[in-house]
Amino acid sequence: MSQLDRKILKRSERMIKLFNEYKGREIKDFPAPPFSKWLNYKIISVKRGEMELEFLVREEMANPTGLLHGGMQCGVMDDCIGITSTTLGYEGFPISIDFHVDFLGKVKVGEKVRVIGKVIREGRNIIHMTAEIIDMKGKLIAAGNSNLLKTNFIPDYVKVADEMSKDK
């Protein structure tokens, strides 16, 4: 294993540890971007390349029929893909370069849903990922896939994880 691979693996372990410290808690207390805090999801499970989140569908997330808005579904899955990508341990934050969504079901205001992000393939520059929204009965609401480009941008929560490792 190269020195770079070891560095990536250690950062992955730190990110997973940080996310596990927030497991079951509302994300509003996490050093996340404003949109993530607004979604106010909870981390249910996390491992390298995979994360499961849960959130309550609120009125401001609905379309005129009282169902989870399609644009919101895209945003939730993109956010899940983004935060899941940080478990890979790369120094920079991967950004979406495309995104495809299939809307397959519906969920009402007041219901909880789970969002599952997974890495399908890690390339040298591009990461292919998927996300699914499922209701609490396991019914698939939406499925999406995205390709992400590795960048040099370091988000605040990666900086927090890196600082935590310096304290020990």
How should each PLM-predicted stretch be described?
Residues M1-K168:
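Terminal targeting signals and extreme-terminal segments of soluble enzymes
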